[in-house]
Amino acid sequence: MINGRKTSPLPGHSGGLPELEARLARELTMLERPAKPWVPRSYLDRCEVLDVAVIGAGLCGLTALAALSFAGIDNIRAFDRAPSGREGPWVTSARMETLRTRKDLAGPALGVPSLTFRAWFEAQFGTRAYEEMTLIPREAWMAYMVWYRNVLALPVSNETNLVGLGLREDGLLALNFMGPEGPVEVVARRVVLATGLDGLGAPRMPDVAKTVSGRFVRHSGDVFDMSVWRGKRVAVVGAGASAMDNAAAALEAGAARVDLFIRRTDIPRVEKFGGVASLGMTHGYIGLPDADRWAFMVEAERTQIPPPRHSVLRVSRHENAFFHLGSPVLKLTEAGDTVEIETPKGHYPADLLIFATGFDVDFGRRPEFSALNDRVLLWRDAYQPPVGQGNDALGSYPYLGPAFEFLPKPGLSAAEAAAISRVHCFAYPAVPSHGKITSGIPAVSPGAERLAQGIARSFFVEDRARHFETFMSHAVAEITGEEWRDADAQDKIKEHTDG
């Protein structure tokens, strides 16, 4: 079913993908991708050190792996806690029917036409089905990402959860995982955190949410079965896309009623970044002075991103959906198996509250990143905004370098500082530093290429002695000396003979 219309794969569609994959292989060959491996291998106690460990194998993680591979960096691997085919939010916590992104964006294709979602979709369902599809169903996107991983042979270890990241004295990074067969230890030269929206923190829950038993409270990013709330009263706090998605999912699952409590007196209507979306913004934002980058982000936070129109209509079409504007939740009171919600406009009973209130960046709430806590430079450390433009949430985001690398706080030892700068944040918290590159599908390819090029540059500089040694010892002759005749030498031979 594609956007309300029953759609079947084309007859013989099993041959559609092989044909596409053959075309993709030819395109990659013509582009010389992946490039020839060039990074010298490193060893520790006779064990090979991984060049790049990528934490997360969702959209950003897979695109990062592909970009690194295309750049000739092949000693790489991603690790994801989810089973194969369930990485990212698409078939777990996401509750929208379709992606919010336009279907024609190139996404993670890295400039390769046959690697696009469109090519994958049309190979199976045809051009007409693609043209009739308005937006991409999230399940189809997940299937595409599985194909993307497989067709590029990207190395991923699933069901492998990071439990600790350590900074070694020699500048290497120690990673401790819990895998399906027990603990796993990995040492890497670089680490890329591709951990999504909550990649450096946890769901943001207002203090009022903590005043009642946890059995009444969920966050929109949690994975839970909405069907258990059939016939129940569900309250959703928030007005963004995830609030609408959760409200709609509850209604479609048979909730008796859904109340949306919205702090603002109106739902945001204008996506400010939509007015400047361009390759100029993608490539230029990183070059802006801090004051300008901060001004963009503060205004975006102030106005907020509106939910898609179709997401709001998905809720409002239900007669048992109720929007309460200008209604911040002031107090929650347990009353047996229900909770009473108090707002400035009244009291409302509910059986479940879903807070669609975003995510915080807080290393302290992620034990696996304890080595980074208070060692990574944050925006509040690097920039002092003018009066009236302060924003504590934005101030907690990492202040990143040009290749998404963390920058060390002043006062660290040389070894600590070096190790910190070898961890790269290719996740949502990179947005204040790099712009909307890691926030979704539209600019993920330019972002991954920036990441890969930066890591490649750092490897070459770090290994420069080994490269220079190779340069000096290279003695493969391109020509033998038999390809020409020295005219002057021939004249001298002739003179000697004539004499």
What are these regions (language model features)?
Residues 86-93, 120, 147, 363:
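Tryptophan-centered motif/residue detector
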Residues 76-81, 104-121, 347:
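A broadly structural signal marking compact, well-ordered functional cores
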Residues 82-109, 268-284:
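Conserved N-terminal glycine-rich FAD pyrophosphate-binding loop of Rossmann-like flavoproteins
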Residues 108-142:
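A conserved beta-strand/loop capping segment in the N-terminal third of enzymes
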Residues 2-82, 130-241, 245-253, 259-499:
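Flavin (primarily FAD) cofactor-binding/catalytic cores of flavoenzymes
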